[in-house]
Amino acid sequence: MELSYQEKVTLIKLRELKKASFDELVKETGLDQVAVMRAILWLQSKGLAKLHEKQKRVVKITELGEKYAKIGLPERRALKLLVEKGKVTLEDLREVLSEDELRPIIGILRKEGWATVRKEDDVLTLELTEKGKEALTKERPIDIALKVLAEKREVEAREIEELLSLKELKTRKIGEEDAKAEREVEITDEGLRIASEGLELKEEVSILTPELIKSGGWKNVEFKHFNIHAPVKRLYPGKKQPYRTFLDKIRRKLIEMGFIEMTVESLIETQFWNFDALFQPQNHPARDWTDTYQLKYPKYGFLPDETLVERVKASHEHGWITGSRGWGYKWDPRTAMLLMPRAHATALSARQLGKGVQIPGKYFAIQRVFRPDVLDRTHLIEFNQVDGFVVGETLTFKHLLGILKRFAVEIAGAKKVKFLPDYYPFTEPSVQMSAYHEELGWVEFGGAGVFREEMTKPLGIDVPVIAWGIGIDRLAMFKLGIDDIRYLFSYDLKWLREAKLVW
């Protein structure tokens, strides 16, 4: 059996001692602690030694305890002053005690029976008792415990508990309890056999230095063998939060594809941008409190410039110049002013189109949205969407399907994708995209479509616009290989450590 130099030295000592503490082995072998521990673990893995560990309760002296060991406990200093003067006031005690020490001192002196307390001319006075005189030369359990701690720095808890309760020591902040691992190493029968056969001690060299090469000394030394297949402890180096990394990669990918990221000013939108500018009628059920959140205070925001508002109003009421009949109701600007947390990132697309865009042009945003829902492994009430649109004169619905499929396959790593007809007030035709997840089955990613003219024309756009809003959290589930969407925002250290890096 191949053994390293450190293993041989440790095994030989164990043959002599049969059983030894870790500290004893360090002392006897002359090796450092790391080398001895490494040797013990290797010997144990080879069945030549056994490592026994048990937890031992210890008490360590605190910084305050060290201070009191030097200058004395507050009651001892107060007692010394009382013996000198016979009678003291609180002002007298301030000469030897801090304000923090002064507060409990009267109670301690009375409890110990060292002083009586009374008022003389409205001044609180402490007078020494006979018991107090005798106490100056007697040690209490707490005095002995402090002396032991000051001398040894660390003692077994049972040694202190024989004197007084640990609670008293900890309450006074003189000592603190801790757990300490006690290690003992024992040689096995196989270890005894190997050690008894005679082990040649030849120090090994683990590093080939320039000096060894120049001097030729490398010819006469034995180099340490490294087992590159040996099992080692798994390391968890620092890394970025997996989901955050995924979002950054998508952002970079879209920019590489020529998309421009939209500027986002706030998480709060007016209903105008969230619904009205998207040609969603004010009596639509999706605007109900069960499907969206509303701000209680402030309740109302501001509408954009009057010209744009009038166009949107006309589009809703009678279709404006689009050839549509609109929704045929009286549009209410007060409803459009209501504030709400953004319900979908498409509100950002409406804002961008209203500001003006390059034609042809491609735009995107990755933003947080909020919707009332039942939390489960595929639904959150606060989640991210990647919203985007492409504007150009020759764009068709087929271009949109191609972009969506590329998203699912290249970005999410989906193997199977399907499209189903859908309905949205602001797109026609509309489509829903789903992808197949091994654990969850078919998972809906989001919706898409061609923006209706009733939406785009009031915003000043006269060419086709294809658009989509995709639940990026669900894309991340595919890419990160998880089956519960809540893990994306989890503080679970095990998951954060073991989650794979994407791309």
From Swiss-Prot:
* EC assignment: 6.1.1.20
Residue positions annotated to bind L-phenylalanine are 346, 385-387, 426, 451
Listed name of the protein: Phenylalanine--tRNA ligase alpha subunit
| Organism of origin | Thermococcus sibiricus (strain DSM 12597 / MM 739)
Q: What is its main location?
A: cytoplasm
Describe the subunit structure. Tetramer of two alpha and two beta subunits.
* Residues noted as binding Mg(2+) in the record, renumbered to the chain: 428
- Subcellular compartments: Cytoplasm
